């Protein structure tokens, strides 16, 4: 099993979107940066904010693209290419409509499920979808016509509370990847219940 060398948190740039459901991936990267006592810095050649850190003695880079969601692959592709990071060494953290708020799942590979950020990352990695995903449940509005408005709005107070709890657990599980391996971290996160 490959070691994770790049952790990417997806979101949209700017204050307008900072607290919206679509930025759940970025929220987790911010927590990881605090946990590892590092600050993300703008890096124009990578189209995002990034930092290098050591987790349990292993070098890893954190990245938040500063492009809009549907261009996330531009940042991921640029950084992965520059540092020769393979798709299977990348963990992408993103919001997931098909999971309820308060849940999260780790997996490798799979489709994009209509998520435009994932779609662009797959394309920019040469149509390789073999990267890991940490999917943060945000719930579903009920009808696909409501999705765009739903992901670009703030979660309800109850959902925000559920998200805070699962983000705490996900932060621990990401750190666990570097200490105990992906399988143990996946089993723990995928069975988490509030």
From Swiss-Prot:
Site (Discriminates between blocked and unblocked aminoacyl-tRNA): 12
Binding site for tRNA: 17, 68, 70, 116
UniProt entry keywords in alphabetical sequence: Cytoplasm, Hydrolase, RNA-binding, tRNA-binding
Listed EC numbers: 3.1.1.29
Single GO MF annotation: tRNA binding
GO biological process, one term: protein quality control for misfolded or incompletely synthesized proteins
Matches recorded under HAMAP family: Pept_tRNA_hydro_bact
Protein name stated in the entry: Peptidyl-tRNA hydrolase
Gene behind this protein: pth
């Amino acid at each position: 099993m490959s070691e994770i060398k790049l952790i990417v948190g997806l979101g949209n740039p700017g204050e307008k979107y900072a607290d919206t459901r679509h930025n759940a991936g970025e929220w987790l990267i911010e927590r990881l940066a605090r946990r590892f006592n590092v600050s993300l810095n703008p890096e124009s050649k990578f189209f995002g904010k990034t930092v290098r850190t050591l987790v349990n003695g292993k070098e890893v880079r954190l990245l938040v693209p500063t492009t809009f969601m549907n261009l996330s692959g531009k940042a991921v592709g640029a950084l992965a290419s520059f540092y020769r990071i393979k798709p299977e060494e990348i963990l992408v953290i993103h919001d997931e409509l098909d999971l309820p708020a308060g849940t999260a799942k780790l997996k490798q590979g799979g489709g994009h499920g209509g998520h435009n950020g994932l779609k662009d990352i797959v394309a920019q990695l040469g149509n390789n979808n073999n990267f890991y995903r940490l999917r943060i449940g945000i719930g579903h509005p009920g009808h696909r016509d409501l999705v765009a408005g739903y992901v670009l709005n703030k979660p309800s107070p109850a959902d925000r509370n559920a998200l805070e709890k699962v983000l705490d657990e996900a932060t621990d599980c990401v750190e666990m990847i570097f200490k105990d391996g992906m399988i143990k971290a996946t089993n723990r996160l995928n069975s988490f219940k509030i």
